[in-house]
Amino acid sequence: MTSGAFTAAHLALIPQVERLAKAKVVTASTSIGTGETSIANRLKRGELVDIVIVAEHVLRQFIAEGLVLAEGLRVVARSGIAFAVREGAPRPDIGSAEALRRTLLAAKSIGFSASESGKYFTGELVQRLGIAGEVLPKSRLIGGGERVGTAIARGEVEIGLQQVSELMPVPGIAHITPLPPELQKISTFAAGVAARSPDPARARAVIEFLASPRAAEAIRKTGLETP
């Protein structure tokens, strides 16, 4: 079970994982938000899962709640946040804090997710830019496990932000542009063995592979950085 940021990398690695595990891999990609299908709620309902891949601080919270085993946690990737627009739209000017401030003030609508990037946007970024009062009322949460890029491609929001790796696979969007360095937030993603895993030893072996140099190239191709 993985959050969106690692989904593309995981899907690319499935053939290797299946050879290693000698079993077919079933993937559930969903949000770390609070909806019924969120990873937290699915774990709390007792769904049988072998591996959980989410932001490291979320995984440690799952460990504290007894949903994930403490043994075997490994960092598998790091990711930055980017903005994107609909295909055919001009490239947004977000090369500096002041440029991003102007762009967000001028945008008619802004999309964000319930995951790490959205929490950073609503809880910190716009406050640091001093524009929370102007920007948050025209910002829209893209929930239900849907990617922000999909809403951008449909024209439902003019601009949106999410992890780079979550924007890259989405058709119909363009100009995926990372936040300026002074405002960038790098999230660390980690994998752990679910407490109800039927085969913890096999799950740990897969996690070791995901954190190893053998998986690094496929992970980097999806817009993530490796440990």
Task: Show the residue positions of the predicted features.
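Exported/periplasmic ABC-transporter solute-binding proteins
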Residues: 1-37, 41-50, 56, 60-65, ...
